[in-house]
Amino acid sequence: MSQAGVDRLLRGLQLLLLVLRLSAGYFPEERWNPESSLRNPTVLIALLARNSEGSLPEVLGALDTLHYPKERISLWVATDHNLDNTTEILREWLINVQNQYHHVEWRPQEHPRWFKDEEGPKHWSHSRYEYIMKLRQAALTSAREMWADYIFFLDADNLLTNPETLNLLIAENKTVVAPMLDSRAAYSNFWCGMTTQGYYRRTPAYMPIRRRERRGCFPVPMVHSTFLIDLRKEASQQLNFYPPHADYTWAFDDIIVFAFSCRQADVQMFLCNKEIYGHLPVPLRSHGTLLDEADNFVHTKLEVMVKGPPLNLSSFVTIPEKVPDKMSFDEVFLINLKHRQDRRERMKRTLYELQIDYKLVDAVYGKTLNQTQVSELGIKMLPDYKDPYHGRPLTRGEMGCFLSHYNIWKEISERNLAVSAVFEDDLRFEIYFKRRLQTLLHDLETAKLDWDLIYLGRKRMQVDEPEEPVPGVRNLVVSDYSYWTLGYLISLRGAKKLLNAEPLVKMLPVDEFLPVMYDKHPISDYSSHFSPRDLLAFSVEPLLLYPTHYTGDEGYISDTETSVLWDNLTEPTDWDRAKSRKTQQQEKLRSEALNSPSLGSPFDNTARDEL
């Protein structure tokens, strides 16, 4: 490089250094640091509770774990007309957490314990609607008076399982926005249609949003239960819960009154389903009891655990221990493979919530059985057995499943257990499971029914004819050809019948073996190897148990079908699981094959707005 080039380079460097020094402030007093970030907006959380003793430990636990600075949150908590321990739980929680929050307003009302015009604790009378509107309006007024940026309404049985919910809703920048909450049915906390009289209207837009086939933040005519209002928006000043708008002529219902207020203020409600935010129970009919409500919420907790971890309980309230029992069974068996710890923990927590005592049985893992062990057990496959869908022989997984049940039958016989219940670990319980099962046991005793085995969950394979109802026993049919051994009741005599058939020397899958033993298997060649085939088998109807996952579902795992052949450890059977028909959902029944309508559950107290 020439001397002239070097000089130009030096001058350029000097100029750059000068610019940098000027930008940093030549003198110390001219230097500055970047601005700090904005503080989180202030939020008032309004929690209204009545007879919520069963749900509060989990609902408050969710509030405890929200990812939002508690010093930016104020609490507005009201409770009234309680027949349970709701007031004491809320008082204890507020005493323990009040120093974490910016402000706490506590509005308990001890008496009266019911409204004069209500027919029961789940009946929404005119007085109750009016009172809840006044409470919501009082919370809204408090938020405005303290200049809160937002008010977040939360029902006392709505579970926020996503700790980012508040941040996510604020980020949407909407005047009124709700997180879509999941339930065990199609019900959720929004409507997609509304009639000109303000009533619910079914629309084709609802289910794609509810199923998250469409994801986003959608304009809807109604959100309720859990929602956020941005009080910084000018239009929010026109929103009110009480009194109803001067032009209001629709039904006197708090959620409809507020939806009308939004409409009059030209405020669009929005529903977001981008994430899993939380869950809510399906509401009960007006004649429901507090026991129904408690069981309904327990079922909501169980459904949460099917796809996620157990709910957090608030550490700031005293929670009494549950007292599990075996109902009237001599034993309750839970089958689980040791290496399926996630299933084990879920079922342990599930049975605890249902207050069912049980004995954990380590399942036989078929893949670990060597040929010597198989020979010592005397296991031989039923001649010419082929899987009905794939034409393959028995798998080691199916062998392990059979042995797991076989070992329980042996224990029942050896311990002389009169009546036992058997559960696998991949099932989900229907609502009111324990009470419905207790009713069944009572009816069996009253009718003096002679039985050996009763399916609690199954896949009905005979779909052409209805099954025969059992006289004198509600919700019970004579079982036809069925798959699955999710859960069943078995008598001592039934266990002995299965053992006496010597199934190990002519083994087939356990859910094929049982229909053979009650003489309803469609393949006579299989049945001909067993005699007598006099197992007295029945099934509850409607079912009390279902699988947690079906073929093709996210998270579906099969230890029976994805295995190796029983006599060839080198040949895997992990075919396309999305096409495995045996573990698919129940095939739709023809109308003439439906079991009697009178078999509907007496516990079905659900209000089904969107079911």
From Swiss-Prot:
Primary subcellular site in the record, as a coarse category: endoplasmic reticulum
InterPro entries registered for this protein in UniProt: Collagen_mod_GT25, Glyco_trans_25, Nucleotide-diphossugar_trans
GO biological process, one term: positive regulation of collagen fibril organization
Descriptive protein name: Procollagen galactosyltransferase 1-A
Catalysed reaction, written as an equation: (5R)-5-hydroxy-L-lysyl-[collagen] + UDP-alpha-D-galactose = (5R)-5-O-(beta-D-galactosyl)-5-hydroxy-L-lysyl-[collagen] + UDP + H(+)
Species annotation: Xenopus laevis (African clawed frog)
A GO molecular-function annotation: procollagen galactosyltransferase activity
Glycosylation sites: 85, 173, 312, 370, 568
Secretion signal, residue range per the UniProt entry: 1-24
A Gene Ontology cellular-component term: endoplasmic reticulum lumen
Alphabetical UniProt keywords: Endoplasmic reticulum, Glycoprotein, Glycosyltransferase, Signal, Transferase
Compartment(s): Endoplasmic reticulum lumen
PROSITE patterns, A to Z: ER_TARGET (PS00014)
Endoplasmic reticulum listed as a keyword: yes
